[in-house]
Amino acid sequence: MDRIRIVGGNELNGIIPISGAKNAALPLMIASLLTSDTLTLENVPHLADVELLMRILGNHGVDVAVNGRRERQEDSYSRTIHFTCRTIVDTTASYELVSKMRASFWVIGPLLAREGHCRVSLPGGCAIGTRPVDLFIEGLTALGATMEIDAGYINAKAPAGGLIGARYTFPKVSVGATHVMMMAATLARGTTVIGNAAREPEVVDLANCLNAMGAKITGAGTATITIEGVTSLSGARHRVLPDRIETGTYAMAVAMAGGDVVLENTDVALLETAVETLRRAGAEISSTNNGMRIKRNGAGIRPVDIVTDPFPGFPTDLQAQFMALMTRSSGVSHVTETIFENRFMHVQELARLGARISLSGQTAKIEGVQRLRGAPVMATDLRASVSLVIAGLAAEGETTVSRVYHLDRGFERLEEKLTRCGAIVERISE
């Protein structure tokens, strides 16, 4: 099992290219099930979750060609992948594959819309709280589907003639459930109105792609999305938007280690709340023609309190990274997690590096320390793993992060990108 070794103390200076967003790429890939034509996606990141989803889609009948060929391209950050699903050959999504990644559960929407029935395993993925599927079930039921849970699977069936447009308001905001209901509604009869919809850029990206395929979606990016159903969708070509979580992660790494880095192929507008929070913490951030520049030279890190919220609030997927940054602040800060009820698993590992963090319910109190000291630590989930890398960049001595398969699910060549900017980061294969 691979490990990441970090020797702390070096500033970061240089250019880091930002990859396509994993959280956008996955639903876009799943949307290929909605059409018999070819969906071409550009700027697809090379990540473990993407590779796994390609296997899952292949089981359903999707032919996948990477960069126009069927061999894998290992030497590029940005890949173009063609997805063609002439016929859906299997409407069952097995536990063996779905349990490995929660987002693969989202195939339930397109399979139900196109074939009228499917059998999908209950999901797995990150061990962050319960993350129930109730919202998915309620949303699809509103479109006329019958849903039955049996032996760990959901058996879903559309009414005769297909799904039927409806008005439905989610009781709480859910990005995944918004993705699924929006995809399913594109082929439903009539008009669907989704209330309390997720407003994340990744939802907008999916809507833009679906519209390019012939869907009629308006309101994406607001709390109310309207979908006029169509009889079929065609192929399209779409570029995956930049990864705002990767952007924020590297921005926090620079704020932690110090230095001057340009993040290319990204957009400050994708994470304005996080950028403003970093400015309050002492980082200098400015827009460039193709991204953003972040500097922290000499100035200390100021304590800042945050509360995670759905977009446009502070992203829960940057909470662990920001907590790592606050361990070196000049005072006391508080991090309150409102999205998931069990997303502080990185706290005990940061404590191994010398962080002073105490928990009270969904709030963490961080007392900044003058120095962190390297130690062996263990990744517990995707975002927690990268928070340990960020802490290691500023820790004295050597930090070794184990179980980095979590890291490979969401960060493309992290050690290579950091090393190019002067960090001492290496992967150790065992």
From Swiss-Prot:
Record's keyword terms, sorted: Cell cycle, Cell division, Cell shape, Cell wall biogenesis/degradation, Cytoplasm, Peptidoglycan synthesis, Pyruvate, Transferase
Active site per UniProt: 126
Reaction(s) catalysed by this chain's protein: phosphoenolpyruvate + UDP-N-acetyl-alpha-D-glucosamine = UDP-N-acetyl-3-O-(1-carboxyvinyl)-alpha-D-glucosamine + phosphate
Species in which this protein is naturally found: Rhizobium johnstonii (strain DSM 114642 / LMG 32736 / 3841) (Rhizobium leguminosarum bv. viciae)
A GO term for molecular function: UDP-N-acetylglucosamine 1-carboxyvinyltransferase activity
Binding site for UDP-N-acetyl-alpha-D-glucosamine: 102, 131-135, 172-175, 317, 339
Compartments where found: Cytoplasm
EC number: 2.5.1.7
GO biological process: cell division; cell wall organization; peptidoglycan biosynthetic process; regulation of cell shape; UDP-N-acetylgalactosamine biosynthetic process
Entry keyword Cell division: yes
Family stated for the protein in its record: Belongs to the EPSP synthase family. MurA subfamily.
Name of the protein: UDP-N-acetylglucosamine 1-carboxyvinyltransferase
HAMAP family, per database record: MurA (MF_00111)
Binding residues for phosphoenolpyruvate: 22-23
GO cellular component, as recorded: cytoplasm
Record-listed 2-(S-cysteinyl)pyruvic acid O-phosphothioketal modification sites: 126
Role, per record: Cell wall formation. Adds enolpyruvyl to UDP-N-acetylglucosamine.
Cleaved signal peptide residues: none
Pathway(s) of this molecule: Cell wall biogenesis; peptidoglycan biosynthesis
Keyword Signal in record: no
